[in-house]
Amino acid sequence: MENWVIRGAVPEDFEAVQALENLDFSAHAQARPDYFREGQVLYSRQEYEALLAHPCPIALVAEEAGAVAGLCFGFVTDHPGDAFCKPRRFALIQDLVTLPEYRGRGIATALLARAREQAVQAGAVSLELCAWAFNERALRLYEKAGLKVQYYRMEMDLRNG
């Protein structure tokens, strides 16, 4: 049985959100020290409040016993179209993070499902996100949730010949 609830994020969640973001960023920096800076705080209070004030935010937290256990942040936006792409409205998930002690309990799946509901209600035709290749656990979660690869972005390290 679930002891957690999914709710909208509020300004008072900032410290817990910042801790989750730092945890997530540290994992990225550890996996790709060549790419990510160490010790950087992803969200300032101003950035967090800007997300909450976005015209169509996805700003969700999972809470258990008064503590924030996970988050899902993003927004719904319109792409005007261009020479190649049709105009469309889509949801972009920027962050989906769960504290390690809460992983494997369905929290991230529930956060993603609620984000999907919000996206549909806002008229989005798709829900999109980016994931790093090293984050295999997240990739499995996304595939299980029904997300499919849209495109591949590849890199070649040019520093060593």
Name each model-derived stretch:
Residues 128-138, 155-160:
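Conserved beta-strand-loop-alpha-helix junction that forms the acyl-donor binding cleft
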Residues 124, 143-152:
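Conserved acetyl-CoA-binding loop of GNAT-fold acetyltransferases
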Residues 46-60, 92:
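A short helix-loop-beta-strand connector motif used in the catalytic cores of GNAT acetyltransferases and
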Residues 95-98, 104-117, 140, 144:
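Conserved acetyl-CoA-binding loop-helix of GNAT-fold acetyltransferases
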Residues 119-130:
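Conserved GNAT acetyl-CoA-binding A-motif
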Residues 25-48:
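Conserved GNAT-fold acetyl-CoA-binding loop/helix
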Residues 61, 67-76, 92, 97:
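Conserved beta-strand in the GNAT
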Residues 1-12, 161:
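Conserved N-terminal entry element of GNAT/NAT acetyltransferase domains
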